[in-house]
Structures are given as structure tokens and as C-alpha cells.
Swiss-Prot record:
Pfam families reported in the protein's UniProt record: DUF150_C (PF17384), RimP_N (PF02576)
GO biological process assignments: ribosomal small subunit assembly; translation
Localisation per UniProt entry: Cytoplasm
Stated name of the protein: Ribosome maturation factor RimP
NCBIfam families in the record: PRK00092.2-5
Function (record text): Required for maturation of 30S ribosomal subunits.
Keyword Phosphoprotein: no
One Gene Ontology term, aspect cellular component: cytosol
Organism: Granulibacter bethesdensis (strain ATCC BAA-1260 / CGDNIH1)
Keywords attached to this entry: Cytoplasm, Ribosome biogenesis
């Protein structure tokens, strides 16, 4: 799995990733949905790992939208959606698999994986350029070829919420009444 699946998504990713990097962001995923009036979905993270906000999404939208207009990548009318990767984010890069080791994920393969299966659920163990590793619920460890991953996404758990809050520096901070 990569940040882009189709040739069009790969072209868009290649165009916008350098500009996002200059702005301090990393591209997590590009998806193009629909045909008549496609929607280009851009998912991004801050390069430093901190959370992105609405203003960041707006800045990314303006920069990416202008570039896509100039390059005329999509000849028809299209929409643009920009978002953060979120807590239950997709795992599209090796660094995502490494960063979220110890958390639960669901994976769908585009090719049969170990045991002929296409769907897996388990604890992320990490990854390298060739394979992502999971410990399944029964304790079996599997190695899934990166180029065979169709979808991989973290599962929302209390542990993931706590880890994300801690990374954002908001863990254990008491709520103040307004």
C-alpha cells in the first residue's frame, strides 16, 4: 500500500507532496472518488507528528487546489477534501507501521496473503519496505507484502486514544468548565 493507488492518484501525489513538505506537512493518502464530478481526498499529517487543525487543512486546500488547477490533472469539474489522518488513520507508509506498533489494525489484501486469506486483524508489529507485520488474535505472527496491501487502518481503542492524546500533549489534562 502506498499513499496513492491509481495512476491518477499517483500523479496527484507526485504534484502536491513537495509543496506540502515545504509547508511542513506529509502526505498520508490521496484518493479520487467518483467519475462525473470526482472528489479528490487529501489526507495529511504535520511532519513533526503534531496534530493538524482546520487552518492547516485550509492552507493545504488552497495550495493543493491551485496546483491541481494549474496542472489541469482532472479535466472535468472536481471537488477537493482535505483532512487530517485522524486517530483511526490508514497505515500507508512504513513509518506509520513503525510509529503505531503495539496498536490494533485491520488489513485487507489485494492478493491472497498467508493461508490464502485477504483480511487480517491484529496488533501492529512494524514494517520495512517489503512487508508489514501483524500479530493475529490467536498469537500467530504474519508478514504481509507491502505491495499487496489494499487497505490498512488502525482500530479505534482506548489505548490508541490515550497514545494520541499523549503525543498531542493533552493527556491527563483536566477539563476546565467554560
Amino acid at each position: 500500500m502506498s499513499v496513492a493507488q491509481t495512476p491518477l492518484e499517483q500523479r496527484i501525489a507526485g504534484l502536491i507532496a513537495p509543496g506540502l513538505a515545504d509547508m511542513g506537512f506529509e502526505l498520508v493518502r490521496v484518493a479520487v472518488l467518483g467519475r462525473e464530478q470526482p472528489t479528490v481526498q487529501i489526507m495529511a499529517d504535520r511532519a513533526d507528528g503534531s496534530l493538524i487543525g482546520i487552518d492547516d487543512c485550509e492552507a493545504i486546500s488552497h495550495a493543493a487546489g491551485a496546483l491541481l488547477d494549474v496542472e489541469d490533472v482532472i479535466q472535468s469539474t472536481w471537488n477537493l477534501e482535505v483532512s487530517s489522518a485522524g486517530i483511526d488513520r490508514p497505515l500507508t507508509r512504513v513509518k506509520d507501521w513503525v510509529r503505531f506498533a503495539g496498536h490494533l489494525a485491520k488489513v485487507e489484501m489485494s492478493i491472497p496473503g498467508p493461508g490464502g486469506r485477504r483480511r487480517f486483524s491484529g496488533t501492529v508489529l512494524g514494517a520495512d519496505e517489503t512487508a508489514a507485520r501483524l500479530r493475529l488474535d490467536d498469537g500467530e505472527e504474519v508478514s504481509l507484502p507491502m505491495d499487496g496491501l489494499k487497505k490498512a487502518k488502525l482500530v479505534l481503542t482506548d489505548a490508541l486514544i490515550d497514545a494520541t492524546a499523549q503525543d498531542a500533549g493533552v493527556a491527563d489534562s483536566p477539563q476546565q468548565p467554560n
